[in-house]
Amino acid sequence: MMRGPKTKSSQSGSTLVEFAIGASVFLLSMFCVIEFSRALWTHNALADAARRGARYAVNQPASNPPGVATTGLNVGPSLTAVRNVAVYGDPAGGTTPMVNNLTPANVNVQYTGFGVGQGTVAVSITNYQFQFVVPIVGTTISMPDYNTTLTGESAGVIP
């Protein structure tokens, strides 16, 4: 006995199943693109924070008496202000960091040879953990260190 063509009632569930599969693939792809975009934005913002801190630090003296070399990691009277500029965008500090979960403890400032001629300032952002909103890949990833080194400016002061 020959069967006739399939009726519409026997195919009614297939459209719903196809839509569910297609929508889940589309939504998964969309969330992956959003998370990857957030990670790239955070990468760029952290590099910019290191540059912002270094630009501020080169104009701040690392040693009070002229002619005394100041070299070392996390030294200088302007350390807190440099960290605040990198994190909050303001030397006085703030309550909301420019990048989520960035703290002043993530910012290292190194003065080299300040006080005698031209020194350099290196500002680095280390140990930053990027947190995903939707934990598709995982919950956090470690971002690389962001380093910026600039030559100090005399700002018209002769040591």
Spell out what each predicted region is:
Residues V33-F36, Q60:
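Alpha-helix C-capping/helix-to-loop hinge sites
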